[in-house]
């Protein structure tokens, strides 16, 4: 075979798309599609049609460029099997490892609190509106739900991991089906309210502020950062030895791009379908009630006057049940991450990494009591979920997803080739705008 034929053959082999690439594309997509998606239509539709159209333009760049930046950081380590903690320690020493451990824990723990509030509110609105039962004490409901989940976690963690993996695709399918099912109920209210002569760019309800706050919920909803490290390790072990690191980086970027396109298509279609069914005023009402959009849709169909169709009745009950299942799924997934992160912090600082000095069973019990106790306090206090996302969840995710990779690109020699690129400015800007939400919420 000639040299030219060898090159062509090699390029053809390199350009092939493997089954494992499809698996990871769907895996990244499935990781991002969780209960957080149920709040995106509320924030996106809060300001009406023009802000959500601008968010549509920003959605793919935010999802793709931010996750690609994190993947590049994970790829920069010398050990193909090294995770993100090892890579950060390689670049910045033990201090960097401590920082990444803290970031991971505090990126996940507030999400658990958010889901604690959400599942309490979702169950209570389902109990009162769909089942027509008398109102229950909030503290009791939150305690009952958390104890139920603690019981399941304690005695059936392995089973729950399997169940969660099976629930990903039915949940995504149900979102698409609900989006399609809402089409007969679409109305022109959101279009009728567009008045180009009275559009305000600035101010509390201006387009710029609405889109700015929307960026936070996009960072929160379009987030598969917890699985990026495992994804990169898998691809490096599969491709790097045979094709080199540059090809592996391109392959990772290609997979992240396809996963981002799938994610944006499903979530934005769901958001637009909800907005055309409801109205900006309804979205504001959902925010005030502190419930996910599926619960609000269920109540919306419950309040329809006259004889309801079987279709509307199915939507009323189906939306609530899907919301509950989605939140349970997300809660269990984030609980396992929070438990691992808290145990890691205790081991690192309390026992200096020596696992022989502590019983893991005892450590898991203490961590569970702290996690469930703090979640119950937050669930009972019932802070506004969107405010909690914008002030805590999204900024911490942005620190890990956007700013940490950008800092590494400036400081780490192995990432020097990525310096001076325009997409770095975009990722940095998204990270800073998300973190600045904290200042906006304070003042």
From Swiss-Prot:
Membrane topology: Multi-pass membrane protein
Transmembrane spans: 22-42, 44-64, 97-117, 140-160, 163-183, 207-227, 259-279, 319-339, 366-386, 389-409, 423-443
Family to which the UniProt record says this protein belongs: Belongs to the amino acid/polyamine transporter 2 family. SdaC/TdcC subfamily.
Role of this protein: Involved in the import of threonine and serine into the cell, with the concomitant import of a proton (symport system).
Coiled-coil annotated residue ranges, if any: none
Family matches, as Pfam families: Trp_Tyr_perm
GO molecular function: L-serine transmembrane transporter activity; symporter activity; threonine efflux transmembrane transporter activity
Cellular component annotations (GO), alphabetically ordered: plasma membrane
Cross-referenced InterPro entries: Amino_acid_transport_2, Hydroxy_aa_transpt, Thr/Ser_transpt_TdcC
Catalytic activity: L-threonine(in) + H(+)(in) = L-threonine(out) + H(+)(out); L-serine(in) + H(+)(in) = L-serine(out) + H(+)(out)
Main location: membrane
Cross-referenced Gene3D superfamilies: Amino acid/polyamine transporter I
Name used for this protein in its record: Threonine/serine transporter TdcC
Organism field: Salmonella paratyphi B (strain ATCC BAA-1250 / SPB7)
Keywords: Amino-acid transport, Cell inner membrane, Cell membrane, Membrane, Symport, Transmembrane, Transmembrane helix, Transport
Localization of this protein: Cell inner membrane
């Amino acid at each position: 075979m000639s040299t030219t034929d060898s090159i062509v053959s090699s390029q053809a082999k390199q350009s092939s798309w493997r089954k494992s690439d499809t698996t990871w594309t769907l895996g990244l997509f499935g990781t991002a599609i969780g209960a957080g998606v149920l709040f995106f239509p509320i924030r996106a539709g809060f300001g009406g049609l023009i802000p959500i159209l601008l968010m549509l333009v920003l959605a793919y760049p935010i999802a793709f460029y931010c996750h690609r930046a994190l993947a590049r950081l994970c790829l920069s380590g010398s050990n193909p099997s090294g995770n993100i903690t090892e890579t950060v320690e390689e670049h910045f020493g033990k201090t960097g490892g401590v920082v990444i451990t803290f970031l991971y824990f505090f990126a996940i723990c507030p999400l658990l609190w958010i889901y604690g509030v959400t599942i309490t509110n979702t169950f209570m609105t389902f109990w009162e509106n769909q089942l027509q039962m008398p109102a229950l004490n909030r503290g009791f409901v939150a305690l009952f739900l958390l104890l139920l989940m603690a019981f399941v976690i304690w005695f059936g963690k392995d089973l729950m991991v399997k169940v969660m993996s099976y629930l990903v695709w039915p949940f995504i399918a149900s979102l698409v089906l609900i989006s399609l099912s809402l089409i007969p109920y679409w109305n022109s209210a959101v279009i009728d309210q567009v008045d180009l002569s009275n559009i305000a760019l600035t101010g509390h309800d201006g387009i710029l502020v609405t889109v700015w706050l929307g960026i936070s919920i996009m960072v929160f909803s379009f987030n598969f950062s917890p699985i990026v490290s495992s994804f990169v390790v898998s691809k490096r072990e599969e491709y790097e030895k045979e094709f080199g690191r540059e090809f592996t980086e391109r392959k990772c970027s290609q997979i992240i791009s396809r996963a981002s396109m799938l994610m944006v298509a499903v979530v934005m279609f769901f958001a637009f379908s909800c907005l055309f069914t409801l109205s900006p005023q309804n979205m504001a009402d959902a925010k005030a009630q502190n419930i996910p959009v599926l619960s609000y849709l269920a109540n919306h169909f419950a309040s329809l006057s006259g004889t309801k169709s079987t279709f509307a009745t199915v939507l009323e009950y189906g939306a609530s049940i899907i919301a509950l299942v989605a939140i349970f799924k997300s809660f269990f997934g984030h609980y396992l991450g929070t438990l691992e992160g808290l145990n890691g912090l205790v081991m690192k600082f309390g026992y200096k990494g020596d696992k022989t000095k502590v019983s893991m069973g005892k450590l898991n019990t203490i961590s569970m009591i702290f996690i469930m106790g703090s979640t119950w306090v937050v669930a009972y206090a019932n802070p506004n979920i969107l405010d909690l996302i914008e002030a805590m969840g999204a900024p911490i995710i942005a620190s890990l997803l956007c700013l940490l990779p950008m800092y590494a690109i400036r400081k780490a020699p192995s990432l020097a080739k990525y310096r001076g690129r325009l997409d770095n400015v975009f990722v940095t800007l998204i990270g800073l705008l998300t973190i600045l939400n904290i200042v906006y919420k304070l003042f």
